[in-house]
């Protein structure tokens, strides 16, 4: 894998060679890439996000909630640089087996609130695989394909810990090559107890990136945020560019270009971001599954 030397402002240098992270991702379907963002960049992103939260009317719930702040690439140049980190993207391109990738929704700044009423409860549901491996759009008879059509690229603005609702997942579940069975979403998730006996949490330091195969079974677990504090992360669904976007990205692109946010970016970040977030979907290659159009639906995470 090519060596990457030039890093934009606010980007950290991961502690291992890109090939080592890639090998771990190929082995486990999940890897933590440390030091994607510096502490200064993290603080700027937190401050910018809190300013956006304060503008919301009505104000979002203070507890037991998970929501998104839209258009983060217009109000935080650090988010733009974070989602285009060259080491993370090099790992993803190698894993997907193509240079031509894109984001299937605009980068989603998410805020997971502390729990209160949900503390000690075991909510039903939540277990899923990520786009494009959704049962309403992905053909069931193509789950056994050897090719990989999606990666989740999430950036931890705050540390992911067991006490602040680090994402629950089933290690190795991407190899099952099926959507989570119905029983995973019945009776609540009790880690260590069937059918959730193998469930772990994606623990990682602030500034790290979680990169995992989109077929991985996982869920957000708001009920486990006992920290009393918000936990912030940037979510990205990355696919080969022929995979149709999960949602219509046109409005996000319009808001971005009208904001003139790109004028504050270095050339490499600007070009990469435009390709990932604003390029057209590529023609469908021969032999790949046809991803159906996802029907519009209400979303707590605005993407």
Describe the predicted segments one by one.
Residues 2-11, 184, 216-303:
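Non-heme Fe(II)/2-oxoglutarate
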Residues 93-102, 143-147, 157-164:
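Secondary-structure boundary elements
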Residues 123-137, 184-198, 225-228, 249-259:
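Short, surface-exposed loop/helix-turn segments at secondary-structure junctions
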Residues 106-108, 153-155, 234-238:
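A structural signal for short, well-ordered beta-strand segments
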Residues 1-27, 34-141:
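Non-heme Fe(II)-dependent double-stranded beta-helix
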